[in-house]
Amino acid sequence: MTILKWALIFLVVSIIAGIFGFTGISAASADIARILFYVFVVIFVVLLILGFTIFRA
């Protein structure tokens, strides 16, 4: 269940980065937040798949 916990953490982080990046708070932080959003979404999906397949007890 540890991998799934990390997957959920990365999901929350990606949502927070998306909130800051997609609402137009500032131009500089928006670009960084958009990049972080997509990075964390990819990490979330990878960890979610691994949690349900390889790392299952």
From Swiss-Prot:
State which residue ranges cross the membrane: 6-26, 35-55
Q: How does it sit in the membrane?
A: Multi-pass membrane protein
User: What GO CC terms are in its UniProt record?
Assistant: plasma membrane
Presence of keyword Transmembrane: yes
Q: Any idea which UniProt keywords this protein has? A: Cell membrane, Membrane, Transmembrane, Transmembrane helix
Provide the protein's localization.
Cell membrane
InterPro entries from the UniProt entry: DUF1328
HAMAP family reported in the protein's UniProt record: UPF0391
Annotated family: Belongs to the UPF0391 family.
Annotated NCBIfam families: PRK13682.1-1, PRK13682.2-2, PRK13682.2-5
What is the name of this protein? UPF0391 membrane protein RPA3029
Q: What lineage does the source organism belong to?
A: Bacteria, Pseudomonadati, Pseudomonadota, Alphaproteobacteria, Hyphomicrobiales
